[in-house]
Amino acid sequence: MRVVIQRVKNASVKVNNKIVSKIFFGLLVFVGFSINDDEKDIDWIARKILGLRIFNDKNYKMNFSVLDVSGELLIVSQFTLLASSKRGNRPSYSLAARPENAKKLFDNFIKRLKKKSGLNVASGIFGSDMKVNLLNDGPVTIIIDSKNRL
């Protein structure tokens, strides 16, 4: 499971030219699931996201988590995070979870974040062609892979 986390002032997702979700301050999280991911990966990544101290304190030191600042989360599925470009110029997505498995993991991930955080957790529409609009704050961008926890 791989996530790209961006601290944002606001972010939104459009599908078919209609805004389907929006946050005003918090974290935009792009998430991709691999063929070997399970509930342990979801738990670990959810804890990491909620505990990451990447919001500034009064001295502009990154000292607060999204929980500390009562931010929001916008979760967007992105299987291309599992791309491999080792061979040739066309990325391979053979490490990405099959859509039916990834959808279950995506739904469980959102439920887990809502349960653990109590924050507003918005999401894109899994499998849709989405247009993501965001205003980076910093910018602060963090990449986490659950396979690196071992």
Model-derived segments and spans:
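An anionic oxygen-ligand recognition environment, strongly enriched in 2H phosphoesterase
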Residues: 95
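N-terminal, polar/charged subdomain of small-to-medium soluble alpha/beta proteins
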Residues: 1-88, 92, 100, 104-150
